[in-house]
């Protein structure tokens, strides 16, 4: 997208925020180069990468790419044949070791490629070069020094060099002791790369040798004694041999690096891509941002065949404003209307609202999470057109109005139904009557095109036009006449009101002047303001009712879940009781069959005492017969039931089961308890499915108990609490939730630095009432909410 568009919507500042969160210099470069893409598949991929990075940092908060270095110039120098310095070679080794460390970290998790498939691509791109890594590690030390292990020749030279050095120093120390009267000071130093001793100028003949230097006073000569000449020569020769061997080693290592140039540059780019993904995740944490949904096109298509795209932003905030004070806005485009016309006072937030939508669209299409509430989403826009502010084109000597018109002309020529158009103060800077007419004509053309858009204006004529025109919707920024300041709330569905007279009165303008102003306004404007005020009052009432309805819905959902759990538990106990009865009956029948066989054998065989066995068997058989017949009578009663208090029944009209708690003969109704609720149903619509408890106990079945559950909200908020207080509240809450029979709960801890989230996860890991837990989905709170499944 055009750089001018990115600048107007301040996307360049988002780039800087992202670059500041990179740990690798190459990643910082990439952060300053990121741009939105219009390829929907690419946007989905970029968001998936950010999602995986956010999950990785949530699970491993201290994760980092480590010691990656920018080795691009080093590799390129090696390709040109320049012999690399040891310190440069070391940067290559550091990068290879950092890449190897990353591979080990990821592969420590057997399912890493399944859990982080997108990040795994970056890690797999960091090709392992074990041979090169081993050669470099053997040759170059952590401070950039060439090690003795670089080659056997270098090790041998350095051993000889050490011995020669020690012999040389030992001989010089002896000379100092032997020639004390000629020595200026008892020390050894170096001149011209050779060891010398300080000799007094007046005793020069006492120390035969070569003078390499003279002190500033002329009193001291620095002499290389002839006695150490060969030792000095040997030491210098070995130094030269060491230098040649080091140069040879560096030449070999340089060639090895040049040969692996493609792989090394690939490692650099893979490391930068991984660090950039982590930076996007860190930015999401800091902005309290969520992953945006990619909304599919909906609705009819315009003649050109372009689908209608959508915007759905809930509690959206401008990412460059302080999130603690920024007022969130809700904006939806593309469902009920295509273009939102925002009116309101200056500095009231109209431009901020427009910029927020545009900037969040750019962020989403660059793979960034957006500062908004879960459930927010946008379509992918191939083109976004923006005209913001009253900047002038000095080079072309254009007026403010002309500058705006040039942008609008380009927009109308290029935009289509897949475009997002954002026009700030449409057609401003000219005669108000002509400007209003021009603005209306532009809006009509945008509707014909089918573009999605937001337009801000001061023209009151556009309020009326938007009210009665399909595809347009009014919106305003709220103004507090008491404080004489905007609240920055965006009120969709309400055109903006004029507050000039209220402000003037509160500032002390004489009442007669205000009254005269009202006369000059005529009746239309005040009536419109009163109508808008009434609409605002009704909107606030509707919002209050909607909030109450949402609370009731959540409570009802909680009660429904609890009732379902209770009914399921009762049904399970009923099935278990019935199975127990059947097992008892089967055992009795088996016993009866065995007794019958014993009687039959006794009757045929004289070996059995016929009278005694037969009488005992008959008595046992009679007992079994009595118990089985009793069970049979019970079964027949179930088939033709007479309903009584305590019976387990099914409400055939509702498909629910419950226990009879009262019978009302006068109305022929039965009162049934289902969980905590009681309902009355006609007796004809109730079917007895299980005997009352006294009868169950007679047929060996345990009673089915129903416990009243306490009401517990399915969500607890711990944001802003200290860890110790939060864990104490959470522990007590989990106990209540389990006793209430909640299968799961939501723990809202916020994102922040992640400290509270980590402490909560550690606490849940060993909690006896917790079956499992997981982070909420990206559209249900993401990293700021943990869903806990309970042992119920």
From Swiss-Prot:
Which InterPro entries does the record match to this protein?
DNA_mismatch_repair_MutS_C, DNA_mismatch_repair_MutS_core, DNA_mismatch_repair_MutS_sf, MutS, MutS2, P-loop_NTPase, Smr_dom, Smr_dom_sf
For the ligand (ATP), the binding residues are: 344-351
Top EC group = hydrolase
Q: Which domain of life is it from?
A: Bacteria
Alphabetically ordered keywords of this record = ATP-binding, DNA-binding, Endonuclease, Hydrolase, Nuclease, Nucleotide-binding, RNA-binding, rRNA-binding
- Could you tell me which residue ranges the Smr domain spans? 716-791
- List the GO biological process terms: mismatch repair; negative regulation of DNA recombination; rescue of stalled ribosome
GO molecular function: any one?
ATP binding
The protein's matches in Gene3D superfamilies, at most eight in alphabetical order, are given as:
3.30.1370.110, P-loop containing nucleotide triphosphate hydrolases (3.40.50.300)
For this chain, the family text in UniProt reads: Belongs to the DNA mismatch repair MutS family. MutS2 subfamily.
Give the record's subunit note.
Homodimer. Binds to stalled ribosomes, contacting rRNA.
Functionally, this protein is described as follows: Endonuclease that is involved in the suppression of homologous recombination and thus may have a key role in the control of bacterial genetic diversity. Acts as a ribosome collision sensor, splitting the ribosome into its 2 subunits. Detects stalled/collided 70S ribosomes which it binds and splits by an ATP-hydrolysis driven conformational change. Acts upstream of the ribosome quality control system (RQC), a ribosome-associated complex that mediates the extraction of incompletely synthesized nascent chains from stalled ribosomes and their subsequent degradation. Probably generates substrates for RQC.
Protein's recorded name: Endonuclease MutS2
Please tell me the species this chain comes from.
Answer: Thermomicrobium roseum (strain ATCC 27502 / DSM 5159 / P-2)
Gene responsible for this protein: mutS2
